[in-house]
Regions:
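Hydrophobic transmembrane alpha-helices and their helix-loop junctions in integral membrane proteins
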Residues: 2-196
């Protein structure tokens, strides 16, 4: 993942929104029969839940614009894999599609912002973008609201279904708390992009 962060922003958009995430999800969808109903399913559930937690925590303390977006990709990958580990391949695919759409838009807009401010990626340096690039700022906000479960955007429906399935399936309280943390922690680091 660190090589994809250093790459030019269109390459990062391609790798993080489709290639990297889709390859892992596709492999688990194809091999999900191997771990359904076994002890390996609980191990994968724990592994993916810890991935969600650590990537979300790392993104909260980062100031590099592309690293924040990349760590949120890793966290979303954990959410998708967690959905697959409890047996909902169609929901995982739907969440993958909504994630890819908003993540690609966010990376392309981040590339436009970085280009506009002379290759600075530190969000503490970026400021008053609304007056400089209003259309790009609008697209960034649209992508952020898609990730933050704003009503009537695809992220709202996919993340709401994730929470509903986690609640209905009566999974362990620890895993349910981690899912709620992940779905709501995206608010913090996306608001940090908006704030700075």
């Amino acid at each position: 993942m660190s090589a994809a962060i250093v790459a030019p922003t269109p390459v990062s958009a391609l790798v993080h929104s489709s290639t990297l995430v889709t390859a892992g999800v596709y492999l688990l969808v194809r091999f999900r029969v191997a771990f359904e109903g076994s002890d390996m399913q609980i191990t994968l559930l724990l592994l993916f839940s810890l991935t969600i937690f650590m990537a979300g925590l790392g993104a909260n303390f980062e100031y590099d614009l592309k690293k924040i977006i990349a760590l949120s990709t890793l966290s979303q990958l954990g959410v998708i894999m967690r959905i697959l580990s409890i047996g909902y391949a169609n929901l995982g695919f739907f969440h993958l599609l909504s994630h890819a759409l908003f993540k690609a838009l966010l990376f392309i807009c981040a590339g436009a912002v970085i280009h506009n401010i002379k290759d600075y990626q530190d969000i503490r340096v970026i400021g008053s973008l609304v007056s400089q690039i209003p259309l790009t700022t609008f697209c960034i906000n649209l992508a952020k609201f898609g990730f933050m479960r704003e009503s009537f955007l695809a992220g709202f429906y996919s993340k709401d279904l994730v929470l509903e399935i986690a609640f209905i399936r009566n999974i362990f309280l620890f895993f349910f708390i981690l899912v709620c943390y992940r779905v709501n922690s995206v608010l913090y680091f996306l608001f940090s992009i908006l704030y700075f």
